[in-house]
Amino acid sequence: MQNSESGSDSPASVALCSSAAAQAPVAQPVTASPQRVLVQAAGSAPKGAQMQPLSLPRVQQVTQQVQPAQHVYPAQLQYVEGGDAVFTNGALRTAYAYNPEPQMYAPSSAASYFEAPGGAQVTVAGSSPPAVPSHSMVGITMDVGGSPIVSSAGAYLIHGGMDGTRHTLAHTSRSSPATLEMAIENLQKSEGITSHKSGLLNSHLQWLLDNYETAEGVSLPRSSLYNHYLRHCQEHKLDPVNAASFGKLIRSVFMGLRTRRLGTRGNSKYHYYGIRLKPDSPLNRLQEDTQYMAMRQQPVHQKPRYRPAQKTDSLGESGSHSSLHSTPEQAMAAQSQHHQQYIDVSHVFPEFPAPDLGSVLLQESITLHDVKALQLAYRRHCEATLDVVMNLQFHYIEKLWLSFWNSKSSSDGPTSLPASDEEPEGAVLPKDKLVSLCKCDPVLRWMRTCDHILYQALVEILIPDVLRPVPSTLTQAIRNFAKSLEGWLTNAMSDFPQQVIQTKVGVVSAFAQTLRRYTSLNHLAQAARAVLQNTSQINQMLSDLNRVDFANVQEQASWVCQCEEGVVQRLEQDFKLTLQQQSSLDQWASWLDNVVTQVLKQHAGSPSFPKAARQFLLKWSFYSSMVIRDLTLRSAASFGSFHLIRLLYDEYMFYLVEHRVAEATGETPIAVMGEFNDLASLSLTLLDKGGCVWALPPVHSGGGGSP
């Protein structure tokens, strides 16, 4: 090949000179049988500059064994066929010659690489690093016609012919090893990353590929990805790169990513569009509080199917639902969209049982048709409540309750809720009929059972996993919702009899208490997770725990709890072993669940099961308080960690026992916890069922042989 200005090409050889006047060979010819060899050429120099021959001492002969896998490496390259000699000439522009066989090119600024069939010995001539022109090429496979070719690793696409300009790369679902090495090379050049960090970068890139994938129509905040990366580095004791370098790293792996600014006005954040967490990634359980703006990865309908009927008192509100979709409410709906990934939107709402009227005589003004109408209306009302909560639009609840419990009287004409598309209108009973129906004890008991089913479903939707990290904004929204429930319901039912109000408020109070407990448990779990991941803290806790005089603890607790000494010793040894193994929070949860199973196994199917479960909670709490007391007196360095762990384990034990009792009695956990609240209004009903499960007995009463 001659220089680029002459425009003539040689079919298979390239000869470069160190100056126009003389040729000084700087390397031995590269000889090989029919194989392709990629050799780095010297950088171009300004025209007219006096070029000096390169001195021989700077030339190095390098013999390498080439792996059989084909790789694409970034470099400024020359293509050489057969056994032709190669010389450098800094005065000439870089030129390429290619034949109809597939060839390799590449844009970037990186070191020299070559490829050849496995087992071949190739001698490469090298020199001091040359200047790399701005139009350097990247390694891509293409044919002479310029048609797109996908490389064997399935990593790239290229469009157009090789004309010395830049070419667009389109990334598919996987990145080849060459992509990772190219990203590291680019970061080393552009960011000045030292060579000893390049090995770490390779693991970071692989971590990206293991946890993220490309997907259309989804996005993640830039800060979300970087925070996940920082957590990864902290857990594996690695030195992270800065945010800017990490952004370049991501784009090197997931090529073609776009950046968008998403979110409500005044609270928008930059997002990467076209990337999401893999469904099986462990990061799905490690979402941080700062990630609450992450977009949902599956579409969920925001608009509730049911809305409170609009008042027609004024002309401005007549015939329009615009007040339900004012700008502030739309903003709240938009924000709630980002929390959908943390709740269970696939929950199936159970069916309600039919009211058991028995031989009860209905009032003259109440008929069986009215009872059936109440069943339909109340089911629809509960479905509307479920839809609103599932869309995290808590402010609609008050409107729904006001609409249902304050419908017009029958003398004022018909009234109804806007129904769904599948059901006819006429779902709201007149208020006088509703009051009369609620005065009937079987109807009130049926309504209370329906409330237990509804509120248990809402708990499982809002907090599907009490140990899974959720954003603090969602937790606070749930707690504010729980705080408002009793006031909203009392206000909506102000005209109803006191017994009806007490029954309804008793159930909703149990629902609110459950939400507060579960959100507190979730908060404790996230705080304890950091402690359990700290090796030094775990070692200190184990050292302090070994100094506790458990024999003295057993002597003091035995009179109160009357537990078997063998059971206590076994729990002590299991606890120390689990702590020594530096178990994760999920492993501790499994251990606690197994403890409950073993202790209550002997009472399974027995009427004494609720009492035994209650006694176990009391004894567990008493023993743990005795251990904390001993640690306090010894001024243990890990007292704070033990206190946090003790709070979490006590709360989680309560959660486990609550569900075991509900399972044993055939009730929902909401019903189990609501029985004490309903005692004042429904004491006779509860006595017929065998007494209140959670009425606490004297602490000195024994039984069960459980710790």
UniProtKB/Swiss-Prot annotation:
Subunit structure of this chain's protein: Homodimer; probably only forms homodimers in testis. Heterodimer; heterodimerizes with RFX1 and RFX3.
Subcellular location: Nucleus; Cytoplasm
GO cellular component: cytoplasm; nucleus
Taxonomy of the source species: Eukaryota, Metazoa, Chordata, Craniata, Vertebrata
Sample GO molecular function, one term: RNA polymerase II cis-regulatory region sequence-specific DNA binding
Family assignment from sequence similarity: Belongs to the RFX family.
Presence of the UniProt keyword Nucleotide-binding in the record: no
InterPro entries: DNA-bd_RFX, RFX-like, RFX1_trans_act, WH-like_DNA-bd_sf, WH_DNA-bd_sf
Keyword presence, DNA-binding: yes
DNA-binding span(s): 204-279
Gene3D superfamilies given in the database record: Winged helix-like DNA-binding domain superfamily/Winged helix DNA-binding domain
Role this protein plays: Transcription factor that acts as a key regulator of spermatogenesis. Acts by regulating expression of genes required for the haploid phase during spermiogenesis, such as genes required for cilium assembly and function. Recognizes and binds the X-box, a regulatory motif with DNA sequence 5'-GTNRCC(0-3N)RGYAAC-3' present on promoters. Probably activates transcription of the testis-specific histone gene H1-6.
Phosphoserine: residues carrying this PTM: S33, S420
Composition bias, Low complexity: 315-337
Ranges for region Disordered: 297-337
Gene Ontology biological process: acrosome assembly; cilium assembly; regulation of transcription by RNA polymerase II; spermatid development
Keywords: Cilium biogenesis/degradation, Cytoplasm, Differentiation, DNA-binding, Nucleus, Phosphoprotein, Spermatogenesis, Transcription, Transcription regulation
Annotated protein name in UniProt: DNA-binding protein RFX2
Source organism per UniProt: Bos taurus (Bovine)
